[in-house]
Amino acid sequence: MGSIGSMGKPIEGFLVAAIQFPVPIVNSRKDIDHNIESIIRTLHATKAGYPGVELIIFPEYSTQGLNTAKWLSEEFLLDVPGKETELYAKACKEAKVYGVLSIMERNPDSNENPYNTAIIIDPQGKIILKYRKLFPWNPIEPWYPGDLGMPVCEGPGGSKLAVCICHDGMIPELAREAAYKGCNVYIRISGYSTQVNDQWILTNRSNAWHNLMYTVSVNLAGYDNVFYYFGEGQICNFDGTTLVQGHRNPWEIVTGEIYPKMADNARLSWGLENNIYNLGHRGYVAKPGGEHDAGLTYIKDLAAGKYKLPWEDHMKIKDGSIYGYPTTGGRFGK
């Protein structure tokens, strides 16, 4: 079940390409326009070099960068849909590929902070999935918590796609939500620096294994004069093994063959370690059909809006003041 990548379309399944886009240095709207041109050029070049590719993925922050002094300013924000997403849609249609792109999205409510958003565009140039990051990387990220849940859409080669953004991938419940809604290929786009490199690799594998689904993950690469972004695009099999692992090179293209039917077959035919099923059917050998209530306190408390850790009252950091953000909520950083 290994993969060394490919230039051609497999007979079944599909070929994916994850682009380790160089971390953008963005100081003006002109720089954003340049990034968009670069992303579109790279999309077309990737299709030309890998003619069988059907899904091309770009990392978080590849469009607008990570200039923390300006990333909340109106100059740096985009709309979804908007002029810029139309350019991406045109490129996907011309190249006849699915594309995954990152957008820092202006909040329709002008009184609140922007969203960190991912979109999937199909080969007809239509936005078929829009996801807003549910778990911003607090306390450093100022994005408003996403309000669209975890959508799933049809993709190439029998795939059902979902996208999470960077820190979302550290939340196992979110990967489980995607799988519970039918996802068999879980995409993660990130702008992480090296502090969490090992944890990135670990969670990409565990998200695959716990849910019997492929994971395809890609991070920015390079140095932005403060942090180094590690690249290391990773494709994991549904059994949690790594099929392809990128390096730390900016512009590296990590490719691999994905066979969604194999993940689907595992979900249907496995007994041992079919854990996404076992969660809701505990002890089904002794009790026909199993016990449907897992008895998990935190799930019940989350559902009731009462989630609270035993040590929560004693925690030192529960707002963004360490990074200079106000603690009153509402729109800031315009």
Swiss-Prot record:
CDD domains: aliphatic_amidase. InterPro entries: Aliph_Amidase/BUP, C-N_Hydrolase, C-N_Hydrolase_sf, Formamidase. One of its GO terms (molecular function) is formamidase activity. It is an enzyme of class 3 (hydrolase). The keyword Isomerase does not apply. GO terms for biological process: putrescine biosynthetic process from arginine. It catalyses: formamide + H2O = formate + NH4(+). Its EC number is 3.5.1.49. The active site is at E60, K133, C166. Keywords: Hydrolase. Residues 14-260 form the CN hydrolase domain. SUPFAM superfamilies: Carbon-nitrogen hydrolase. Belongs to the carbon-nitrogen hydrolase superfamily. Aliphatic amidase family. Is an aliphatic amidase with a restricted substrate specificity, as it only hydrolyzes formamide. PANTHER family: FORMAMIDASE, NITRILASE C965.09-RELATED. This is Formamidase. It comes from Helicobacter pylori (strain J99 / ATCC 700824).
